[in-house]
Amino acid sequence: ALIPGQPTPRSALTYLAVETVLQAVDRLEVRGRDSAGLSVWVHLDEADRALLAGSLAGRADPLLRSGSAVVTGDGVCFVYKHAAIVGKLGDNGTALRLALRDDADLHAVLALPSAAVTVLAHTRWASVGRISEANAHPVDSRIAGADDAGPFSIAALNGDIDNYGALAKQVSYEPDERGITTDAKVIPVLLSQRLAQDADPGSALCACLGDFAGSMAIAAQSETGDEVLLAVKGSGQSLYVGLGHGGFVVASEVYGLVATTSRYLRVGGAAWPGATRQGTVLALPRRGSGTLAAIRRWDGDGVLRPVEPAEVRTAEVTTRDLALDSAVHYLHKEIHEAPSSFRKTLRGRLRQGAAGVQVGLPPSSLPTEVRRRISDGRVREIVVVGQGTAAVAAQGVAQFLRAAVGDRLVLTAMPASEFSASCLRPDMTDVCVIAISQSGTTTDTNRSVDLAKDRGAAILSIVNRRDSDLTTKSHGVLYTSDGRDVEMSVASTKAFYAQVAAGCLLAIELGRELDVLTPEREASLIDGLQRIPGQLLALQESEELLAKIAADVAARYPYWAVVGSGHNRVAAAEIRIKLSELCYKTISTDAVEDKKHIDLSAEALVLVCVAGAPPGQVSDLVKEVEILAAHGNTPIVLCDEGTEQSWPTDLVVGLPLGHPEMMWIVATAAGHLFAYHAARRIDAVAEPLRVALARLEGAVDHGLELSAALPREVLVPVIDVLEDADRGHLRGVLTSETALGLARLVLQPARPGLGPEAFSFQATQPVDLARVVLARAIDEVGRPIDSVKHQAKTVTVGTSRDDADVYDNDVVVAMRDAGVDLHRLTLPVLRVVRAQARVIKRVTGVTYYRVGGAEEAGTIRVVRKTGSAAGLASRADHGAPLMGSKRRVAELHTARLLRGRSDGRVVLVVPEQDCNRLSHLCVVHVELHERCAPRDLVAAMDSAGDRMAEIVAAVTETVPSFEPARLGELPAEDVLLAPVEWLAERLAAG
């Protein structure tokens, strides 16, 4: 317990706040736990501050390590930290609680009448700076040997500050390998310097954010006020501000705050509309804490952005979802929850009919109108899309659809990003898109759905999260499980099975609707579905065998492959994803029969999925496995229970029997379990190296000189790893470069010539060198399992398909109606047309010309006229030379907005190409909006040339600056087409 003795009601609330933050750390450390820190900033009135005079002087620490205390202008800041390269989830929280419990000074200060606290904590996956108490966050603004330039400040960081080195020089901070080397250090230093200039805290952090490069989330505090400052920049990080009855709770993931409140405000790092810089900054004061009205918010430019009530969201995850129970990792827990997820997906969707059990989907899942469009033939094609694991689930759903509806519909499965890139048509009213997403917020999938729906496609979605973005875009929704089946692990498992279950239900329903499925066939498929949960449960009895095989082979083989045939191609594809995600392997996947034609000589570890194979195919598959084994490969076979003796390998796992067409689902589950245990085996290789690094850092903290030889206790674990490598056990995970680096550390004391200069690493001292070598080795073989390394180190985004809407404007429609072949319009031309369409009020007509001869001396002839152009005589009605503005468009190969010299008509001239040769010109007669938004005018000018730059240059010849907002005050036609000098005079005159 944190509370000593009998606390006052006021201090009891304080201890509750501290424990709330510690519980959030406990939940968040699944994403990183090599160190953690917590500050308790106690705000005191003047009388209580006087009582502290000199009492905490002995706790000053320039490195702000655990147990340090800093007396500030408004109270005192206590700091507690724990760093452990070797450890498990929960260790950091335990260490911090013990330090807090045993701190008599803290308890005495919290008992003072005026004491009020803010608590800031952080759990770290180190990317910059060694793992140590000094580098654990929060860090402070003080620089050893320098006078304090401004108010005392502290900060914690998620993400990386890419220009940390340059900023450290700017603030005259020299990182010390014995001290603080994390990039987070520049945050409080810069913030303090900004505050010294009398800046408002929020404005000061906005200014700092503009100096930082990278993707980051920041929490900071200063003695200039009692508010906590937050900042987010870039697309790789976010923060969530929980609105609780007792105050604000902030976390980098929603599950960090749900124990206190389910209501939250998300803080993202993208640029606000109209802002020139990315980022958002918030100030959370103690007064009004927990209320939306108390929050102040700025964009990256420092402009206030009020918080609206409509921005508040409700979390779906609960504390129950966060409990690990007896599992070591969330991934393992979630694989074991798969039978329940599958069963919940079937529940309520199977009904007893006259002919037995039947699928019965409600109109909310399969709307009546969509059902009619499919049954009467208006829908002729179904496309199943998803991204990542959901894209593989889409392949499985498409298989069930083929089995259920036969050739009545064209069936395709593909990644959503590919669908939006190459498969969209102007008219998609004959298409039904089935979109699969665990979260309902996948960028690629949702963008594809938007584009298909705009073109008339029917949209059905299979999604886990209720009220998510995808559900609002869909005509019908099939929720997986109970619509809120949370996955904490980054690698998705149980959602995959549930998505397949929902897709199979939909396939059976459509098969009956189209009168393709016989009652017997439907009953067989439904029976197979109902047996899957039991099979998944029975599979867990084979986990010990899967774990043993993984322990024997996972670290031995550098090359891996997963193969399958028929339905098992889907299993192979999904197992490949999990093996790649968890084990950081580049893995191939092929049909079993193709493997011998591709890389048979790789001597690889090959996972062979053959469960449910037709009896007539089994003997052929056995021969394929024999060929693999004969060429030095190591096959692991996932087959039907009872056939284990048929396969020419000792590594065989029999799977619980079920419907042959659904055995691939069970094979996938077996592959997931194998992937989990393979990752654990690989990660175990890193454990002795973590021990070595922890011992080294401990020795440094206790005075080991950087130039000293490495202690024997550091080298012993390294020797153990090298001996394992010498036996061939680590050939698949330890590169030769890393192994040589480790060997040189061991040989260095006996071979003086193998000092730091013998390495390619930039290290000048033996201890520095050992840090680099050990850290690289740990990074090479460490496997976090519930997290994915690249998601912690880099920015991950989805495709936005910004150019997928280039056909979605009235100008393109008018050209199409006039006979223009839209496929002959280049993407740069379409982008210009899209930009110009934003300033065009309406299209009045089109003149379509054919271009003949060489472009330099070609001719044009009218092919077709529409609208207002139909009554206009043209010199090219019977052919004429290509000249004037049309010739200029032909030379530039880009669209141009022009005004006729004689008639004053405004037209958009668009070139059409055939095999890179100009074939046609389309002159679109248009009427512009009287006034346009400045951003639309700028976009139109920038799309087709440098007119905007010319305007700015001309205006600033006579006035010091130019504000683009002025463009909106003038007629759009003048802005876009009037002579630049004339326009500049009007703008300069104001």
Enumerate the language-model features and the residues they cover.
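Conserved short alpha-helical segments that host acidic/polar catalytic motifs at enzyme active sites
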Residues: 1-380, 519, 537-543, 549
